[in-house]
Amino acid sequence: MQKYLPVLRSCPFFTGLTDDEILSILHCVSAAKITRPRGSYIFRAGDSTEVMGLMLSGSTLVIQEDLWGHRNILSKCSTGDFFGEPYAATPGAILNISVVAEEDCEILLLNVKRLLTSCPTACDHHQKLIRNLVSVLANKILLFNDKITHVSKRTTREKLLSYLSAESIRQSSLSFDIPFDRQQLADFLCVERAAMSVELSKLQKEGLLVTKRNHF
């Protein structure tokens, strides 16, 4: 795990921990590294899990799919991001999301049940890690609240402007990249891609924005 320490140090989950403490914690939570090719499922809706995933490399999409193949993207996870935390922290919870590899990726699986029970080595940094987990979960709630704000808008135009405005504020810049391609953005905002493309074209003609691929 030594080679992944630069990634782990940057994660909010490990904030305030030394390298030795991080390595000790990985042992406590039965950390296991897996690799998955593009298009494969890491978690499937309908299953349950005791582990959460930490992206070491590559990217994944957290999605919801119905029986007719309609897809709703909840979030995109890149290097250093987590997925599955709420389900792993809730014993017996059934996943209503799936996690799919957007590209070849390396993932570290962490057993949250081991974290939430008494640490067998009684490590001093165990409580700090639990506080960090609470912070990670709270941040995830804020991200989903943002999505609700965007998709609750009445029109495709309003959804686009809500999302792009929020991204501009988040990145503190009027020029920014978004993590989605056009189809993914449509799936994230729960709109039809064709209708979204029409609105983007109108917004450009009106001088409200300039866009090329995922850059605005």
Labelled PLM ranges:
Residues 39, 50-63, 78-80:
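Glycine- and acidic-residue-biased ligand/ion/polar-headgroup-sensing regions
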Residues 1-38, 87-91:
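Cyclic nucleotide-binding regulatory module and flanking cytosolic helices
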Residues 154-216:
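Phosphate-/nucleic-acid-contacting segments
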Residues 22, 95, 113-155:
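A small-molecule sensor/coupling module
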Residues 60-72:
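A short beta-strand-loop-beta hairpin characteristic of the jelly-roll/cupin
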Residues 73-131:
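Cyclic-nucleotide recognition modules
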Residues 41-47:
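Short phosphate-coordinating micro-motif centered on Lys-Gly-acidic
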